[in-house]
């Protein structure tokens, strides 16, 4: 929106042409989302408290979590609001990827919102059925896959890129691409949701991963940089960097209120949406494997649940004291803040490893 205004003003004052630079708009998007989140945060938390949208805590979990009962949840609405407003302000609204990302973000956010609402109304920590949640997540992911492959302008936009190796690619057909897109988007969405179990645990990793994906998006959208770094050139992908920057800024603002002891929880409305958005960005810029590396924390959390369930069904025994993984370490004696900060450090190392694939090929 502001880009259109800047283009018009640029005809009279050349200084406004500076807003054509994606890097500047990405920085401004991050700051804008951060500002909106910090400004609206107290009001949103107050309204959630007035609506008695309190978190229902599992009684079979760590007993230290019982004090969190009643803390306002659905704080992800603040994140989505900040991202939405900021993206509309600073992104190029003629870019197809911008609208796809907003559709995925708010589509999965709506699923999470309904899930959270059921938890609050019925005081049931389980929310809506897993089958219903998976159905709607799948519908959104398949839509994204079909849309991307039907609008792809170059073969590179649908090829799987293997990091650390030059020119090692695997072309996909329509079905293969949609299947990959499905697993990346739905998998990341649920993995982030599983990670969001401690104060600040999910927000900071999302900040780091989204900031790193912004770099990949900028490079993929620039033919010169993409060629130099042996990455696929995806026309228009540079605008995705603005969205990623907005996501990082919004989550950073949310962390201000979600840091221990949390004043508000993200809820499914935020976690499902952020995970799906990260997955969609990775698919757009053809960095699904790199997302698997940088989002290793999310992968570990999801795997811990799958391993726990499979082990219990097959052998009747549990591998972990409790799943997801962060609860396992809590029950081993780690304090909540120790788990969170140590998992942040792990994510930082994984993100740096992911960024290294830009050059190490």
UniProtKB/Swiss-Prot annotation:
Gene Ontology molecular functions: metal ion binding; phospho-N-acetylmuramoyl-pentapeptide-transferase activity; UDP-N-acetylmuramoyl-L-alanyl-D-glutamyl-meso-2,6-diaminopimelyl-D-alanyl-D-alanine:undecaprenyl-phosphate transferase activity
Protein's name in the database: Phospho-N-acetylmuramoyl-pentapeptide-transferase
UniProtKB keywords: Cell cycle, Cell division, Cell inner membrane, Cell membrane, Cell shape, Cell wall biogenesis/degradation, Magnesium, Membrane, Metal-binding, Peptidoglycan synthesis, Transferase, Transmembrane, Transmembrane helix
Keyword DNA-binding attached: no
Organism this protein belongs to: Laribacter hongkongensis (strain HLHK9)
InterPro entries with a match to the protein in the record: Glycosyl_transferase_4, PNAcMuramoyl-5peptid_Trfase, PNAcMuramoyl-5peptid_Trfase_CS
Pathway in which the depicted protein is active: Cell wall biogenesis; peptidoglycan biosynthesis
TM region(s), chain numbering: 25-45, 73-93, 97-117, 134-154, 168-188, 200-220, 240-260, 264-284, 289-309, 338-358
Organism classification: Bacteria, Pseudomonadati, Pseudomonadota, Betaproteobacteria, Neisseriales
The protein's role, per its UniProt record: Catalyzes the initial step of the lipid cycle reactions in the biosynthesis of the cell wall peptidoglycan: transfers peptidoglycan precursor phospho-MurNAc-pentapeptide from UDP-MurNAc-pentapeptide onto the lipid carrier undecaprenyl phosphate, yielding undecaprenyl-pyrophosphoryl-MurNAc-pentapeptide, known as lipid I.
Catalytic function, reaction form: UDP-N-acetyl-alpha-D-muramoyl-L-alanyl-gamma-D-glutamyl-meso-2,6-diaminopimeloyl-D-alanyl-D-alanine + di-trans,octa-cis-undecaprenyl phosphate = di-trans,octa-cis-undecaprenyl diphospho-N-acetyl-alpha-D-muramoyl-L-alanyl-D-glutamyl-meso-2,6-diaminopimeloyl-D-alanyl-D-alanine + UMP
Lipid bilayer topology: Multi-pass membrane protein
């Amino acid at each position: 929106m502001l880009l259109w205004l800047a283009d018009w003003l640029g005809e009279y004052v050349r200084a406004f042409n500076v807003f054509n630079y994606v890097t500047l708009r990405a920085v401004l998007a991050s700051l804008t989302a951060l500002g909106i989140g910090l400004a609206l945060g107290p009001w949103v938390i107050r309204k959630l408290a007035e609506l008695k949208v309190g978190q229902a805590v599992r009684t079979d979990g760590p007993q230290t979590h019982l004090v969190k009962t009643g803390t306002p949840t659905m704080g992800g609405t603040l994140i989505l609001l900040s991202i939405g407003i900021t993206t509309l302000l600073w992104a190029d609204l003629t870019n197809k990827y911008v609208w796809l990302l907003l559709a995925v973000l708010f589509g999965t956010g709506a699923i999470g919102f309904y899930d959270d609402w059921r938890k609050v109304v019925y005081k049931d920590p389980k929310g809506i059925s897993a089958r219903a949640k998976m159905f709607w997540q799948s519908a959104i992911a398949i839509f994204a896959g079909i849309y991307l492959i039907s609008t792809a302008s170059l073969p590179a936009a649908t090829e799987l890129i293997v990091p650390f190796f030059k020119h090692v690619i695997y072309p996909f057909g329509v079905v293969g691409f949609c299947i990959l897109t499905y697993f990346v988007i739905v998998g990341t969405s649920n993995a982030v949701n599983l990670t969001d179990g401690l104060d600040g645990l999910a927000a900071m990793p999302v900040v780091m991963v989204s900031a790193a994906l912004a770099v990949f998006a900028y490079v993929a959208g620039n033919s010169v940089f993409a060629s130099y770094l042996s990455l696929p050139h995806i026309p228009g992908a540079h605008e995705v960097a603005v969205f990623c920057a907005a996501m990082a800024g919004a989550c950073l603002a949310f962390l201000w209120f979600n840091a221990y002891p949390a004043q508000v929880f993200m809820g499914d409305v935020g976690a499902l949406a952020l995970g799906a958005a990260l997955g969609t960005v990775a698919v757009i810029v053809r960095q699904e494997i790199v997302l698997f590396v940088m989002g290793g924390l999310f992968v570990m959390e999801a795997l811990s649940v799958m391993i726990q369930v499979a082990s219990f069904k097959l052998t009747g025994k549990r591998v972990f004291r409790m799943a997801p993984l962060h609860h396992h370490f809590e029950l081993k004696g780690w304090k909540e803040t120790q788990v969170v900060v140590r998992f942040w450090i792990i994510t930082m190392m994984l993100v740096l490893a992911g960024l290294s694939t830009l050059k190490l090929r």
